[in-house]
Amino acid sequence: MVDHIRIRGARVHNLKNVNVDVPLGKIVGVAGVSGSGKSSLALGVLYAEGSRRYLDALSTYTRRRMTQAAKASVDEVLYVPAALALHQRPAVPGIRSTFGTGTELLNSLRLMFSRLSSYPCPQCGRWLEPSLAVAAEKPLLCPQCGASVRALSAEEFAFNSQGACRTCSGTGMVMTVDESTLVPDDSLTIDEGAVAPWKSLMWSLMVDICREMGVRTDVSFRDLTDREKDIVFHGPAEKKHIFYHNKNSNQAGELDFTYFNATYTVENALSKVKDEKGMKRVEKFLRQGICPDCGGTRLCNAARTPKLRGITLDKACQMTLVQLTDWVAGVPDSLPEEMRPMARNICESFQTAAARLLSLGLGYLTLDRSASTLSTGERQRMQLARAVRNRTTGVLYVLDEPSIGLHPSNIEGLTDVMHDLVADGNSVVLVDHDTQILKEADWLIEMGPEAGAKGGHVIAQGSIPEIEQNAASQIGPFLAGRAGVNARPHVPENELFAQGRIHLATSAIHTVKPLELELPKGRLTVVTGVSGSGKTTLILESLVPALQAKVNGTALPAHVKSVEAEEIAQVKLIDATPIGINVRSTVATYANVHDELRKLFAKTQDAKDHGYKAGDFSYNTGKLRCPTCDGTGVISLDVQFLPDVEVPCPDCGGSRYSREAAAVKLPTANGEPASMADLMDMDVSTALEACADCKLVRQRLQVLKELGLGYLTLGEETPSLSGGEAQRLKLASEMGKGQADSVFVFDEPTIGLHPLDVQTLLGVFQKLIGNGATVVVIEHDLDVIRNADYLVDMGPGGGDAGGRIVAAGTPEQVRQNPESITGRYI
């Protein structure tokens, strides 16, 4: 019997002809330093081939409607099952997505309400008992007055369909004109452009019509009477005969024109917006608020009327999942006897889906919570629950960093899911660095030994005890507990606030209670807490926008009472969202190295002989870019009925440059002249040696190396970088500056980081702090937590059981706090 997947000659990304057998029916961990080829093996080979072969079994007609993976660069993959992948960074959903729609729990709930609800009689107001007539698509009859009521279908309870509130179209939010933005500078006169929309939305004629309406346009706006201001903001749409003078053409004329007040000017422009560019011009005059008709529930009045167990659908969606599950359990017994079998079937489908989410620690979320406000870890667990709830067998699940966003106390739910999958006859391959999760693996494959070009080899494989004893393994000492991340110097407790403090006061929002937060300036503060305790809300939705508002002199977010941050002039959020969306953005361009290299090449004698300027060396717009691929390095072949195939450009071989560019060489420090294509093909460490004589290039490459990115090639496309790599590359431009007035906020920077890489990351934090910066990190990684100067622990639980600051102080103080769950793991 076949008991393993056989991989031979894998060459995806940096894999070096890898031959490896992956056990089936087991949990297989894939470890290794960042950039060593873990995701290339797990996602680029196993998932790509598993999903592609499954889709190949479908008809051509069906495949045409699906996103297909291209064939992996591998000699042979045998015995691979159909594969499902959970990616490291699930996409941030749109405004129409909620926790209920994303988990599909709302589908069951809508079905429940459409089949089992009570309806009020439209004539006498009496509530009509639930009846099987609804399932038979017959009307309900009022026993008192005989009136008939048509029950709503499940579709009519959907806010993305027929049940949507007419005012907000089912989004729960409306855009209204913000009057405070219409006249940004009231010292100006209307003639000088005081009314911003008339100036920017091309209604300059309104100044002349406004004058005809009786408003003085040569007096500063603040000195106008209330009546005049009201005409500017809300005046009636009257037609006026005006004489106008066009300053540009110096022509005069007369015409009849209808008055558009400042508010209507914006509303009219908004109604005509067709693209993002148009929206950008209008949005500065708008503010988002809760819909006045549906109160943010997204549902029309009809969908908010029927009741089940005494509550309406919008009220059910406002319960936490724990509360809602208890409520659903009591639904069948609250109904007439003949309806209970049908009710049990519907409720059972809800309970089954909810059970998995509860075991993954998401019981604190409400179904109406907007999916875009969820943390990455929460979105990933939603994705995981959806993938595993069907109890299928014989499937390969590839999990990319499933521990993202998971507090050590939440990891148990995740490991239970993995063991359940294997018990059902599936195989699990997980890419992770968390030793707590890797210890659950039956077999471990370690990639390495280094990153990028120096990685791509299998350096160790075996069971966990075998890896712990394997001298070649880099993760082994961490699994065995023999190695740890070296501590950075701690600040004495009495000096924590010596450089000042940042103070934030908020009122309640989501599940977070009113809070008072104090952070020390010039220190490393780590914000911890179980999943759902309110870390994202406190830092990303409160602290960051409050500091940005203070710096920009704009209004604080509605739920922020006050913020005190003396001498803070800039706030930088460094998150793991991908950099750029196309192949034209590379490491060299993002790190500002490419521009400097172009200038150096333009100064060479070869370039002068051919008359080349710096701009000619750009692979995006220069004359030396490859004409075949237009400087992208790849060409896309449109193959009918198959996914588009991207192949390296046959003319430039992927270098992005034409043959003429190869004739221009730059002398390098290691003695071998290099063309621009040669340099773009080097990794950062090699290029650093080659460009040792070029001061500015050397400095910028040195920063990348110190950030632990020495293995990236200069020509690597930025969208292909992992979350952790993207975060550190964003930091590159910030390093080396004086930063006493800066606050850096990191959202889980250890994503994708091996314990050895965490050591580098702590060095980066120390460098920022050495330059005077204040560093705030949302993190679950225990090594980072132990190395903090100051901890803020949210909790004690998730959702309603959390949302407050349980402990704040040094790691030692938090460890001794009995209420802190994080403290038990430090």
Residues covered by each model-derived region:
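Conserved phosphate-binding elements of NTP-dependent enzyme cores
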Residues: 1-826
